[in-house]
Swiss-Prot record:
One of its GO terms (molecular function) is ubiquinol-cytochrome-c reductase activity. It is found in: Mitochondrion inner membrane. This is Cytochrome b. GO terms for cellular component: mitochondrial inner membrane; respiratory chain complex III. Heme b b562 binds at residues 84, 183. It comes from Syrmaticus reevesii (Reeves's pheasant). Disulfide bonds: none annotated. Belongs to the cytochrome b family. InterPro entries: Cyt_b/b6_C, Cyt_b/b6_C_sf, Cyt_b/b6_N, Cytb/b6-like_sf, Cytochrome_b, Cytochrome_b_C_euk/bac, Cytochrome_b_N_euk/bac, Di-haem_cyt_TM. It is a multi-pass membrane protein. One of its GO terms (biological process) is mitochondrial electron transport, ubiquinol to cytochrome c. Signal peptide: none annotated. Heme 1 (or BL or b562) is low-potential and absorbs at about 562 nm, and heme 2 (or BH or b566) is high-potential and absorbs at about 566 nm. The gene is MT-CYB.
Amino acid sequence: MAPNIRKSHPLLKIINNSLIDLPAPSNISAWWNFGSLLAVCLTTQILTGLLLAMHYTADTSLAFSSVAHTCRNVQYGWLIRNLHANGASFFFICIFLHIGRGLYYGSYLYKETWNTGVILLLTLMATAFVGYVLPWGQMSFWGATVITNLFSAIPYIGQTLVEWAWGGFSVDNPTLTRFFALHFLLPFVITGITITHLMFLHESGSNNPLGISSNSDKIPFHPYYSLKDILGLALMLTPFLTLALFSPNLLGDPENFTPANPLVTPPHIKPEWYFLFAYAILRSIPNKLGGVLALAASVLILLLIPFLHKSKQRTMTFRPLSQALFWLLVANLLILTWVGSQPVEHPFIIIGQMASLSYFTILLILFPAIGTLENKMLNY
């Protein structure tokens, strides 16, 4: 019998073993769709971004008008820009749900996969931040000024570090140029880390909702999960296209329709919605260095999750107390997101402080404590 080229060709067999004949657990739910959706998001962002870069000028005097020109005069430029801007939002929706799935089902016990995932999240956040600066509107400029300024809180080297990042004594032309270079480069870095992430995942195989070994019952990825992923894609594409075509500016800030002006500070400087939870934690501490440390900890805490797992069961499927705590954490993050969008005044200050405190308490203290309690209740 002639050898199957899909299984014998040096390149095709890698694709085959990753996407076609990959043995997958027979019971993974729709929560396992988000990995492939993230891959689609990344591909879409790279393609639309490449097309936008062809019409963009990374210069303070031309950036704003070059974006306006793209939307007005380039064939389907408005569509490409709207897809790119809202694609970022959907990228973050998918990654948050993907991380939530990992937390709920104990996927973090695959430590290498989890750690590369956290690095991916950090790189994505960096990419989104530098990208938001490129249209050179008011919120772009002041967002860049405020967030880069946080590095000045680092003792001794802070101020030097900030001026080195800016390429001068304020956010100006050199800053915009390097941010464009970084925004172009980072998605390809993300692609590289994604391949590493997948490589680590395929060493162990996927986890499943029961958290038990699925070696006794595997099915091929194609056609079962390839089809299921296409369904998930269709379900994500519907709200994505609805948003991008009907209300493309819904999630943006109206302030960014005004060209950047270093002499006028916007009344409320706030980042895009997907950073608001971290921004709320930053603002809740009335000290610059403390706030910066809390901001970093709010994301880096994910690296500690595998070490805080005290339960004898991997997933939360059969652990109602941990489930209640998990959904409390979700509600807490929604409150932080909302508070981050509000002005710094009573009662938002105290709400933000309480929500920030409970965020760290739930993750660092309550999850391990409840896990241990459940072990005792189940006589493990």
